[in-house]
């Protein structure tokens, strides 16, 4: 007989067969499977042995059994745990576990960090030899703690006795421990018990909260020591000690969360008991006392997720793991969340319950006092219960006795009978509970047997083949009067009323839950709380810095007075000055490094004085006055001496620059006056020669000092003697020139020191003191001849005079940082020159690599090498280094270009003054005239900041070529001179565009100082507002920036000035008050170290290198940088073409898109949208100018062929693409009048009324339209104007074609880009031309009902085969069990009988449910499934905070605040308007009402059910009996009380809504279409269609109060609000027909006067709180339906989780391309959106069977024709095909069915044929709210 292979496979796949086969083969020696299994076992064993070797071994030393050791190894698998069993003690297992826990927690902490061990065993820690530093806080809070301390000291003594050698580290610890103990004990004896008195290094006697021990970067741990520490106190202590992370453990049993009063701790062999708010822990077989702790404090560690310390620090509390009965937890500093804007958080915790195989079993006892049954529950093994049930189920009724069941349960308590043999079971039930278990089982079995008999009886009667008369009569009787007698019903009702539990309700077996849920929500407030440097108030920090500086200055002044005696004549500080008192004004830090003049004047800082006074190996020379005549010579000698002896290292010395400046000015005046009065008194020729020879000798000796030390020393002495003699007979002015020469020479030596070379003797002297005379370099650093020295002396007085009278601010641009403010400086310092730049063949690249400083030498150099970015870890560091490298490359490139221009000049390349020079260069010749003579021509503009000075030798070779800081004088009219002030240092001067500003040089050197500072650990958050041109970026800054706290940086100077003007106008302040509004260059050049700001507003940030943005953020200490920019306009441009930048683009953390422009006309907005350059949808504008762009090309009537074809317009702004075109156009137009010509790049960010863009060249360039980089330039060029733009181009490029195409665009399309209120109006469009072009396409009248039926059957197969006509009858006549709570039923009410009602017979067969009848079962079923099935919110909600935040957002986002009307709502006029809308019946009922207000029960409602069930659009009708909708409505008089006010409020709300926020107040499809007219179908949206379940019934107090607060904005007074809230809280509903009364908490009542409005705004407010609706382009709300459209690029989080956890809404988010709102699809039809009703609902309703006559059929026909009129347009049907396929997940094409449907719904005869009606149409009027 053949064997079926499928049966064999079925047998083989069984688990038992497989196990048996493997077992048989594996145990057979020699088989292949046996060998494989043995090899696998061997490998597994060897792997386990190897893993055990690498684990850390811990000897717990306690006397533990092998089972306990194995349990410890199982609980802590990362450790190899053994025991030497050398110690016995109390609860050994717990002690061993505590030791392992300590080791685990310590292993998670950095080894070199300090650790606070709360309640830790310091005796154990002190004996550690692992280098850890642990401080234990061990307070004595009870006698046991004191005993512990004594035992620990005994263990220390034992350790000392047993150890022959003690490691030095441990020995030092024990010594310190003993010293601290002696001190603590002495303090306690003296009754000193303050925290400071009990403090020690390794342990203290304080609580952790009071511990005064401090350690940097510390951690904390707590091993079973937090039970009695309040969680808040612990957090405060952690914050005070600046602890970021704490770990700990504590005993825990999940039974505590389940509410049990006692339980076991199985792994610890212990137990717990809860008593009077405390939990007691104890251990079995342990004589030691247990522990008692505060249960409430312990529960906080279990339930809390966050805890906020008093200083504002937020600690995140996490239960990391549970090992046995020990719970591990951590507290981590999470304050940064608040900085990132987190204001609320909720967490879900669940603790597993290890009782998966147990059952909750009920047992009963009789109370001896009350003789009542007492119910309790126990946990029993699932196997035990199942075996017991199986046994009792097999017993016959006579055998079902307590004896038999007791015997069985006792004999099989821990054994299982298998095949006649017993097998021991691990679990055993408490024998004392056997009798109670037996009782429950017997009663439960008897109950089940009775139910089985009843089922069998009824089933046998029903299953008979033959039907007799008695059976039918009996069945009829039961159908009519019910199967349950009235007597039994009454008794059951009475039992429910007295809470008498009976039947199966009394005995239920339930499974144990898998986990216990713990929830917690903590509010994170934004209140300022300074804490550990995380939340830093910059203003407070500035105040503290100023106080510190004032204190330091006072210390310095006092130090001057103290050491003046030591210095003797070195100090010039008067006694009166020492006693001066500082005034109370703010101190300005004006310190700078000490120079020569400071030492001579006695301005010596404290740190230098301390070192100086302590030294004895220096010169102690004296002088008669502050300015010694031999001072400079003595400095040189001192330098020689210091060079020969070991060097002295002095700390940096700072002086007050302000005081030094005042003294310097006074001395300059004195020198000038002295020079003038003695102008006729001079040296003789011989004396001058002798003096010059001495100075020349001095300079020569200094130059060769290092090579000839001994010779130089003697030479210096001789030179000093010579100068000393000359000083006696010569004027101070001459000596000053010598000093100046020495200073210049000395400065070169100082530069050499900066390059990193060996220090020279001159710098040694300079480290001690500097000259008091202002250094003025008037010649080359190599000047040494007597003639040049004499020339220098003659020029000195002139230079002093010119500089003293000059008002131009100058600054030293070559020193690293100018110490004194440039605003206060009146003396100019000529740039320093480095020795590294003397050699012509040495490039700046090599110099940069050694010194990181750019020299002043101008020469041709190679670009520096690219930095090694791999050294830097973060993107910000790489960008900053690249920015520095870029600046250096720019400087080197510019200098190379300048040097090339000079070389070309010397080579005779330039010879004609009429021809322009490169870079608008100009040469000044100082060899003929001291004022200089222009060689070729003047520059186009004066005022250059720098020039290039160079001198030539006799062979016309360059001897020196350096950058020079220029000064420009002004005439009496304030106009700048055409020539700069002669520096008299060079023969020629080059001026060029490259040297006009040269900000890069100063910025680079300042940023070098910034780089030296410590890198920030937390980078600023970069936010970009990516806006189209003219979107109001500067206006946004004006409205959001705080000019007193924030920093506003702009790339361009014009933008900065514009912002300053706006701020001055807004804040009524002067420009001097706006120092925080700067250009980026100005900030980095002058004030880079003077300001701090938490928020930086960076205008046009994308035009700057990313590294510059990061530098500004770091310098200011910013937390947030808000960048304004346009991602599509001209970005940062690399001006050094030979290098490639990798990190120039800014890394954005958050981007906000702005696509509304206020500048550009309508055609420009359409042009930008058409080009699709901007993501995020259509670009719209507020500028109503329709057409603004024109073009003139080479083939026009007046062709554009040259620059002379461009017309002149006085007020127009001319733009070109390149600088060369700019120059050509300027030259062509300047003769016609004043003209403004700029490049496109220069005008980015600017606005003009009329713009003329000019392209002169026909050759290609990458920035021209159509070029590789042309897009940004096209955008900027076309978006600068408000009124007009004309593009003159010599070639028909892409911009020419685009503008030409724009002239052909229809006006109606252009108008879609105009953003105004009227374009978004809900009740009509301003531009009627849109409707003219929107013509519908006629639908042919074809098709039959068969096509419709076929489509329906294919989409919803099986629905048409179900006949649900008798479903209501079966439900009403069959037994049904409905459990209801808070509900009563009056059995004396008449019971209705189901009636067979039929109407017209439809042609289509659909799942349209029949009309239900108002029967008790239907009413209770609807109550159960609707009102009683509402979800219950489990989370704790701070309602008032949520409501306040949400309503405030609603006021800003939903409404136009100017239209909000908050006047009185209940007026005579509003009441009359409401009265007129009421029906005649309602008015008659109200007129009969006689109750007064105080007699009304506002909490009483009527209850009924709707007869019509909502049709289901799925296949659920095939297996589900749907519940009817319920209606809960108050009396008419109550609606009359609230109705007028609610109606008025809803009208006010509708009128105050913003255009893009729509309140669907019963709108039809045409009205809905008007609300979406402004939306562009070409724009993609991210649509949110949310379906709420049980919406009305899910309402809580949060919804009710939120809507009330919203209504208060529109005039709802407090009395109405109170009454309305009262009527919605606890309510009683009653069904008079069926005698049902129920009680509801909250819920939206579906029949009150504001059901629709309350539903609408409940949903709207919930969605507003859960989603960023401020970013939505369109939103519409109506009842529980909503549709929200966001720009496509936005990523919006699914709101359903928050809606469920906070707003109690069960919902789901639909992700459809074709969205639906209120049963209508939103379709893209033509050039607009339109709403169209869902045809599937109509097809389903066409199967309705309860249409009774032709009148109702006519009414339905009228209603359908009105609502589905859009079906006449074939375009609608075409889009519906896609929507239906997507919505109903079908591949069927619905086109034919839709066409046939349209044919039958607009012709009454065809419509009537669908219901087999042959009558005529009945004239009727249908209300818009008609439903069928």
Curated annotation (Swiss-Prot):
Q: Where is the Alphavirus-like MT domain?
A: 82-302
Q: Which residues form a coiled coil?
A: 701-728, 1432-1496
Tell me where in this chain the RdRp catalytic domain is found: 1581-1694
* Any one GO molecular function term: RNA helicase activity
Keyword Transferase among record annotations: yes
InterPro entries according to UniProt: (+)RNA_virus_helicase_core_dom, Alphavirus-like_MT_dom, DNA/RNA_pol_sf, P-loop_NTPase, RNA-dep_RNA_pol_alsuvir, RNA-dir_pol_PSvirus, Virgaviridae_RdRp, Virgavirus_MeTrfase_C
**Region (Methyltransferase) location:** 61-812
Keywords, comma-separated and alphabetical: ATP-binding, Coiled coil, Helicase, Hydrolase, Methyltransferase, Nucleotide-binding, Nucleotidyltransferase, RNA-binding, RNA-directed RNA polymerase, Transferase, Viral RNA replication
Enzyme Commission (EC) number: 2.1.1.-, 2.7.7.-, 2.7.7.48, 3.6.4.13
> Has keyword Chloroplast?
no
Quickly give the catalysed reaction: RNA(n) + a ribonucleoside 5'-triphosphate = RNA(n+1) + diphosphate; ATP + H2O = ADP + phosphate + H(+)
Q: Where is this region: Helicase?
A: 1026-1289
Q: Which GO terms describe its biological process?
A: DNA-templated transcription; methylation; mRNA modification; RNA processing; viral RNA genome replication
(+)RNA virus helicase ATP-binding domain sequence ranges: 996-1154
Instruction: Name the Pfam families on file.
Output: RdRP_2, Viral_helicase1, Vmethyltransf, Vmethyltransf_C
* Boundaries of every (+)RNA virus helicase C-terminal domain copy: 1155-1320
Q: What else is known?
A: The replicase large subunit is translated as a fusion protein by episodic readthrough of a termination codon. When readthrough of the terminator codon TGA occurs between the codons for 1320-Lys and 1322-Arg, this results in the addition of the RdRp region.
Its family remark reads: Belongs to the ssRNA positive-strand viruses RNA-directed RNA polymerase family.
Question: What is the annotated quaternary arrangement, including any partners?
Answer: Heterodimer of a large and a small subunit.
- The protein in question is named Replicase large subunit
């Amino acid at each position: 007989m053949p064997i079926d292979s499928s049966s064999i496979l079925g047998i083989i796949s069984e688990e038992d067969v497989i196990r048996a086969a493997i077992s048989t083969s594996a145990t057979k020696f020699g088989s292949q499977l046996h060998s494989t299994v043995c090899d696998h076992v061997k490998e597994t064993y060897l792997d386990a042995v190897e893993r055990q070797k690498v684990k850390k071994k811990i000897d717990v030393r306690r006397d533990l059994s092998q089972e306990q050791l194995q349990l410890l190894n199982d609980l802590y698998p990362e450790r190899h745990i053994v025991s030497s069993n050398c110690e016995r003690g109390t609860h050994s297992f717990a002690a061993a576990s505590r030791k392992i826990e300590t080791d685990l927690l310590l292993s998670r902490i950095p080894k070199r960090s300090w650790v606070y061990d709360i309640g830790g065993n310091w005796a154990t820690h002190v004996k550690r030899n692992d280098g850890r530093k642990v401080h234990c806080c061990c307070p004595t809070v009870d006698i046991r703690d004191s005993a512990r301390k004594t035992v620990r000291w005994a263990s220390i003594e034992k350790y000392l006795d047993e150890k022959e050698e003690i490691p030095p580290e441990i020995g030092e610890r024990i010594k310190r421990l003993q010293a601290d103990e002696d001190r603590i004990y002495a303090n306690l004896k003296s009754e000193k018990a303050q925290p400071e008195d009990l403090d020690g290094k390794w342990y203290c006697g304080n609580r952790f909260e009071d511990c005064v021990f401090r350690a940097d970067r510390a951690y904390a741990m707590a091993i079973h020591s937090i039970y009695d520490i309040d969680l808040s106190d612990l957090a405060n202590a952690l914050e005070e000690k600046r602890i970021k992370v704490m770990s700990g453990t504590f005993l825990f049993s999940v039974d505590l969360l389940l509410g049990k009063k006692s339980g076991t701790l199985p792994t610890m062999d212990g137990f717990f008991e809860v008593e009077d708010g405390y939990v007691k822990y104890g251990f079995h077989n342990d004589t030691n006392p247990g522990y008692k702790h505060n249960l409430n404090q312990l529960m906080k560690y279990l339930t809390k997720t966050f805890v906020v310390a008093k200083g504002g620090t937020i600690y995140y509390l996490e239960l990391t793991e549970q090992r046995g009965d020990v719970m591990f937890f951590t507290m981590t500093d999470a304050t940064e969340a608040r900085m990132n804007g987190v204001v609320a958080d909720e967490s879900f915790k669940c603790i597993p319950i290890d009782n998966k195989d147990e059952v909750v079993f009920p047992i009963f006892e009789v109370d001896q006092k009350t003789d009542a049954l007492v119910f309790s529950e126990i946990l029993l093994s699932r196997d035990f219960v199942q075996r017991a049930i199986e046994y009792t189920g097999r017993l016959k009724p006579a055998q079902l006795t307590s004896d038999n069941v007791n015997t069985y349960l006792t004999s099989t308590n821990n054994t299982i009978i298998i095949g006649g043999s017993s097998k021991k079971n691990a679990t055993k039930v408490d024998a004392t509970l056997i009798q109670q278990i037996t009782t429950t089982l017997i009663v439960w079995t008897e109950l089940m047997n009775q139910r089985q008999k009843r089922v069998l009886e009824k089933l046998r009667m029903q299953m008979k083949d033959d039907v007799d008369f008695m059976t039918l009569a009996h069945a009829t009787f039961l159908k009519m009067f019910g199967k349950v007698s009235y007597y039994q019903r009454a008794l059951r009702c009475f039992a429910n009323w007295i809470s008498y539990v009976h039947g199966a309700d009394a005995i239920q077996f339930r499974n144990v839950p898998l986990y216990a849920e713990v929830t917690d929500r903590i509010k994170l407030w934004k209140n300022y709380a300074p804490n550990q440097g995380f939340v830093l108030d910059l203003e407070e920090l500035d105040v503290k810095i100023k106080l510190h500086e004032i204190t330091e200055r006072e210390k310095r002044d006092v130090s001057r007075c103290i050491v003046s005696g030591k210095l003797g004549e070195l100090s010039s500080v008067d006694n009166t000055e020492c006693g001066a008192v500082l005034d109370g004004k703010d101190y300005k830090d004006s310190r700078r490094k000490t120079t020569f003049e400071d030492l001579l004047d006695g301005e010596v800082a404290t740190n230098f004085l301390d070192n100086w006074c302590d030294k004895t190996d220096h010169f102690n020379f004296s002088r008669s006055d502050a300015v010694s005549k031999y001072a400079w010579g003595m400095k040189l000698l001192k330098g020689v001496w210091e060079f020969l002896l070991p060097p002295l290292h002095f700390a940096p010395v700072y002086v007050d620059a302000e005081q030094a400046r005042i003294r310097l000015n006074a001395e300059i005046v004195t020198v000038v006056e002295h020079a003038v009065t003695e102008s006729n008194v001079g040296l003789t020729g011989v004396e001058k020669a002798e003096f010059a020879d001495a100075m020349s000798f001095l300079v020569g000796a200094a130059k060769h000092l290092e090579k000839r030390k001994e010779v130089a020393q003697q030479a210096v002495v001789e030179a000093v003697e010579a100068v000393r003699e000359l000083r006696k007979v010569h004027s101070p002015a001459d000596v000053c020139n010598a000093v100046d020469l020495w200073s210049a020479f000395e400065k070169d030596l100082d530069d050499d020191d900066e390059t990193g070379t060996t220090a020279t003797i001159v710098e040694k002297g300079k480290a001690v003191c500097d000259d008091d005379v202002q250094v003025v370099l008037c010649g080359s650093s190599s000047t040494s001849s007597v003639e040049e020295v004499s020339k220098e002396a003659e020029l000195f007085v002139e230079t002093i005079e010119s500089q003293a009278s000059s008002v131009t601010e100058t600054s030293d641009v070559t020193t690293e940082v100018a110490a004194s403010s440039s605003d206060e400086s009146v003396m100019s310092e000529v740039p320093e020159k480095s020795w590294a730049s003397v050699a012509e063949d040495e490039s700046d690249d090599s110099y940069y690599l050694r010194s990181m400083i750019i020299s002043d030498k101008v020469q041709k150099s190679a670009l520096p090498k690219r930095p090694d970015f791999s050294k830097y870890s973060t993107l910000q560091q790489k960008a900053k280094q690249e920015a520095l490298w870029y600046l250096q490359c720019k400087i080197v490139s510019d200098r190379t270009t300048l040097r090339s221009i000079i070389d070309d000049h010397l080579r005779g390349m330039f010879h004609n003054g009429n021809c322009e020079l490169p870079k608008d260069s100009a040469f000044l010749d100082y060899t003929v005239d001291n004022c200089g003579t222009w060689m070729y021509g003047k520059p186009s503009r004066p005022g250059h900041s720098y020039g290039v000075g160079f001198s030539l030798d006799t062979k016309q070779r360059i001897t020196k070529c350096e950058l020079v800081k220029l000064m420009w004088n002004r005439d009496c009219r304030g106009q700048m001179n055409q020539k700069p002030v002669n520096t008299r240092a060079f023969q020629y001067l080059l001026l060029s565009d490259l040297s006009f500003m040269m900000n890069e040089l100063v910025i680079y050197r300042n940023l070098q100082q910034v780089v030296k500072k410590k890198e920030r650990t937390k980078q600023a958050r970069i936010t970009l507002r990516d806006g189209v041109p003219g979107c109001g970026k500067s206006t946004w800054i004006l409205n959001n920036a705080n000019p007193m706290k924030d920093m506003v940086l702009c790339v361009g100077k014009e933008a900065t000035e514009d912002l300053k003007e706006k701020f001055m106008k807004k804040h009524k302040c002067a420009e001097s008050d706006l120092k925080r509004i700067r250009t980026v260059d100005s900030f980095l050049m002058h004030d880079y170290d003077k300001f701090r700001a938490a928020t930086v507003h960076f205008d046009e940030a994308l035009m700057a290198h990313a590294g510059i943005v990061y530098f500004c953020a770091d310098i200011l200490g910013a937390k947030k940088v808000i960048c304004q920019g346009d991602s599509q306009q001209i970005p940062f441009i690399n001006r050094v073409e030979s290098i490639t930048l990798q990190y120039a683009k800014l890394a954005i953390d958050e981007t906000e898109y702005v696509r509304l422009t206020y500048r550009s006309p309508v055609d420009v907005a359409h042009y930008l949208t058409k080009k699709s350059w901007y993501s995020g949808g259509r670009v719209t504008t507020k500028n109503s100018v329709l057409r603004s762009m024109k073009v003139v090309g080479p083939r026009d009537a007046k062709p554009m062929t040259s620059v002379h074809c461009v017309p002149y317009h006085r007020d127009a702004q001319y733009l070109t693409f390149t600088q060369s075109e700019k120059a050509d156009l300027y030259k062509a137009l300047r003769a016609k009048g004043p003209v403004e010509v700029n490049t496109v790049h220069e005008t980015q960010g600017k606005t003009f009324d009329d713009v003329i863009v000019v392209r002169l060249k026909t050759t290609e360039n990458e920035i021209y339209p159509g070029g590789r980089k042309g897009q940004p330039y096209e955008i900027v060029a076309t978006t600068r104007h408000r009124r007009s733009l004309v593009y003159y181009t010599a070639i028909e490029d892409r911009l020419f074609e685009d503008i030409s195409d724009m002239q052909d665009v229809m006006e109606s399309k252009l108008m879609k880009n105009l953003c105004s209120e009227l374009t978004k109006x809900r009740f009509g469009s301003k531009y009627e031309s849109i409707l003219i072009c929107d013509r519908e396409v006629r639908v042919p009248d074809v098709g039959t009902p068969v096509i419709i039926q076929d489509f329906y059957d294919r989409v919803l197969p099986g629905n048409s085969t179900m006949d649900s006509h008798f479903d209501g009858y079966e439900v009403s006549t069959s037994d049904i069990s409905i459990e209801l709570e808070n509900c009563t039923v009056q059995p004396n009410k008449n019971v209705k009988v189901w009636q067979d009602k039929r109407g017209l017979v439809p042609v289509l067969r659909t799942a349209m449910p029949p009309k239900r009848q108002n029967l008790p079962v239907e009413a209770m079923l609807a109550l159960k499934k609707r009102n009683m099935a509402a979800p219950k919110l489990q989370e704790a909600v701070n309602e008032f905070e949520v409501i306040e935040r949400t309503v405030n957002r609603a006021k800003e986002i939903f409404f136009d605040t100017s239209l909000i009307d908050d006047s009185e709502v209940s007026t005579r006029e509003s009441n009359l308007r409401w009265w007129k809308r009421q029906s005649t019946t309602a008015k008659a009922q109200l007129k009969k009402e006689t109750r007064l207000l105080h007699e009304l029960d506002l909490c009483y409602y009527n209850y009924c059910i709707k007869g019509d069930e909502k049709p289901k659009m799925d296949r659920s009708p095939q297996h589900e009996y749907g519940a009817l909708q319920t209606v809960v409505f108050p009396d008419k008089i109550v609606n009359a009380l609230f109705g007028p006010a609610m109606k008025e409020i809803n009208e006010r709300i509708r009128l105050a809504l913003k255009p893009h926020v729509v309140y669907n107040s019963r709108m039809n499809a045409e009205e809905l279409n008007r609300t979406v007219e402004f939306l562009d179908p070409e724009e993609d949206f991210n649509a949110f269609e949310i379906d709420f379940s049980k919406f009305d019934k899910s309402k809580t107090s949060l919804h009710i109060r939120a809507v009330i607060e919203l209504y208060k904005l529109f005039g709802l007074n407090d009395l109405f609000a109170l009454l309305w809230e009262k009527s919605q809280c606890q309510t009683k509903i009653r069904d008079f027909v069926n005698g049902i009364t129920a009680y509801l908490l909250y819920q939206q009542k579906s029949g009150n006067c504001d059901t629709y409005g309350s539903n609408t705004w409940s949903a709207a407010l919930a969605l507003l709180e859960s989603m960023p609706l401020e970013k939505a382009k369109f939103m519409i709300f109506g009842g529980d339906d909503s549709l929200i459209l966001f720009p496509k690029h936005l990523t919006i989080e699914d709101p359903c989780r928050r809606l469920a956890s906070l707003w109690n809404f069960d919902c789901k988010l639909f992700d459809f391309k074709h969205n639906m709102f209120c049963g209508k699809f939103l379709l893209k039809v033509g050039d607009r959106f339109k709403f169209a009703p869902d045809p599937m609902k109509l097809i389903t309703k066409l199967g309705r069977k309860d249409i009774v006559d032709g009148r109702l059929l006519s009414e339905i026909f009228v209603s359908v024709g009105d609502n589905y009129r859009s079906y006449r347009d074939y375009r609608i049907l075409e889009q519906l095909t896609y929507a239906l396929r997507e919505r109903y997940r079908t591949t069927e094409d619905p086109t034919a069915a839709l066409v046939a449907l349209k044919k039958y719904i607009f012709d009454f005869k065809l419509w009537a044929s669908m219901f087999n009606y042959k009558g005529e149409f009945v004239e009727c009027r249908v209300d818009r709210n008609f439903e069928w």
